[in-house]
Amino acid sequence: LTIPLMTGISRELMKVNDHDDIASWWEVIDRTTGEPLDAAAWHYDAATESVVIDAPAAYHEYTVSFLAYLIWDPVHMYNSVINDWKDVEHQIPFDVRQPKTHAYTLRRLREYLESHPYVNVVRFTTFFHLFTLVFDELRREKYVDWYGYSASVSPYILEQFEKEVGYKFRPEFIIDQGYYNNQYRVPTKEYKDFQAFQRREVAGLMKEMTDIVHAYGKEAMMFLGDHWIGCEPFMPEFRKSGVDAIVGSVGNGSTLRLISDIPGVKYTEGRFLPYFFPDTFHEGGDPVREAKENWVTARRAILRKPIDRIGYGGYL
């Protein structure tokens, strides 16, 4: 049985990671029995980017969980697709948790603060891992989970996790029978362990950055969204992060309350819709109608729990 790995996934977005140990970080599961296959029962064909199961059982279903590189930052890809950008260099995500990247990022932050003395609020967008956002070959959104942790993994991070919890990481902790631990699932102990580990590690690195910002006499603001996995503001670890303020996109009343109810920050800001993007601001578009609808859906939430500031975002 041959299972092609990249079918239905944008090759602009991802690349199979066959550099790190496949036997350790990949998993082939017989979904009919629920049991993982021994690593000796399958192999990877790099030429076709496929996993080959040598002796599959008749009528059984099999899945492959594998590591992949994000070779185009999904938010940048989203913006490029929505705005129909042409000939734009693809921005790549990088793992700030890696020691060399960690040191480089802190140095760049200090350089920015020293060269921008007129800035009094530094807005981070965000810290450091993106939610799950996958595109298919036609650049359509294939799977989106604003709370998904699947893009926050690397062998470096997973090895640290194993040392802390004392047991072997399995891809299935995140894959979750194909449900990817979406918010309608009851999380397993292992997945909650991984979330808690990520929050602690992210909060510690956030505190390093906010301490630097404060040392230069400036406030640290966080955008609620995008690369926000591990810094969920209602979890206890966030209170140790040193963030002064929150700004987030207002889709409706519930997302406004998600911003305005955040405890422990000096002020909150809502970014109302529409974004100033060409998908709304174009010949025949009606941004006024969208703005009114957004306001009507959010205003009752403001009465119940006000935000401190209102703004808009985007670029044309």
Show where each model-derived region lies:
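Polysaccharide-binding and catalytic clefts of secreted carbohydrate-active enzymes
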Residues: 1-240
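Hydrophobic targeting/anchoring helices
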Residues: 110, 123-127, 132-134, 184-185, ...
